[in-house]
Amino acid sequence: MRKTLTVLGSINADHVISVPYFTKPGETLTGQNYQIAYGGKGANQAVAAARLGAKVAFISCIGSDSIGKTMKNAFAQEGIDTTHINTVSQEMTGMAFIQVAKSSENSIVLASGANSHLSEMVVRQSEAQIAQSDCLLMQLETPLSGVELAAQIAKKNGVKVVLNPAPAQILSDELLSLIDIITPNETEAEILTGVEVADEQSAVKAASVFHDKGIETVMITLGAKGVFVSRKGKSRIIKGFCVQAIDTTAAGDTFNGGFVTALLEEKSFDEAIRFGQAAAAISVTKKGAQSSIPTRQETLEFLEHA
């Protein structure tokens, strides 16, 4: 029987435009290839996990608008349990305004909308879903009070808690003590620990700060350099795959969804990381957020030929 992953997080309608470079203050640029795509860190990670083979339930909020309803239907078609996606009346679905530069880097501005309603009250309504899960995966695009309560419910019921602390913000020691696995990138690790992560040595220092807060496993994603892992007194960098990137928008989300999926299938940590890395590597070779997330079959074939 497949284990259950519950994802708690955001849903955004992504307004994406390609630009030659990011604008400077006071500058106007003409962009190209404008499109509206489905995104939000929570949604991206839920879709990634579902596409890659996980049994996923998604706790989230949408607005009382047509894009929210359309997105909820799309998640159901991905095989995601949408029972816990709440519709907030007289509110818009969250939005993200994304610039993608020629370098393939992206710059994102968020309008929270319905995401700001993912409160303790909404989480409490989904308590039974969290309690019966095998793993809870969260990010930080929704209110911290809801994230903290979900982590408390999970911990009380022996559910593994994975936090992708993005976008980065200072977190309480109480919340950090409830996390089993944390997956920041270099910037997020620095904001949370005060240690600038530039190499393996500094990553070890940052990881020790997380370990001191009670987090057993620290995984710092290093972009093209791979993933730094620290657990059970040992640390190492697991190198990524070399691909021609054209859009990195959902790379981190795809990695998190893939990693947790493989972990729930009883894969070793290294195997789970490689699976997540392979899925993320494929995603950066395509444009868009959820549209770039590969299927399980694509990912397995990529690993076979890597």
Swiss-Prot record:
The gene is rbsK. It is an enzyme of class 2 (transferase). K(+) binds at residues 247, 249, 283, 286, 288, 292. Its EC number is 2.7.1.15. It comes from Haemophilus influenzae (strain ATCC 51907 / DSM 11121 / KW20 / Rd). The keyword Ribonucleoprotein does not apply. This is Ribokinase. Pathway: Carbohydrate metabolism; D-ribose degradation; D-ribose 5-phosphate from beta-D-ribopyranose: step 2/2. Belongs to the carbohydrate kinase PfkB family. Ribokinase subfamily. Catalyzes the phosphorylation of ribose at O-5 in a reaction requiring ATP and magnesium. The resulting D-ribose-5-phosphate can then be used either for sythesis of nucleotides, histidine, and tryptophan, or as a component of the pentose phosphate pathway. The active site is at 253 (proton acceptor). The lineage of its organism: Bacteria, Pseudomonadati, Pseudomonadota, Gammaproteobacteria, Pasteurellales. InterPro entries: Carboh/pur_kinase_PfkB_CS, PfkB_dom, Ribo/fructo_kinase, Ribokinase, Ribokinase-like. It comes from the Bacteria. Requires a divalent cation, most likely magnesium in vivo, as an electrophilic catalyst to aid phosphoryl group transfer. It is the chelate of the metal and the nucleotide that is the actual substrate.
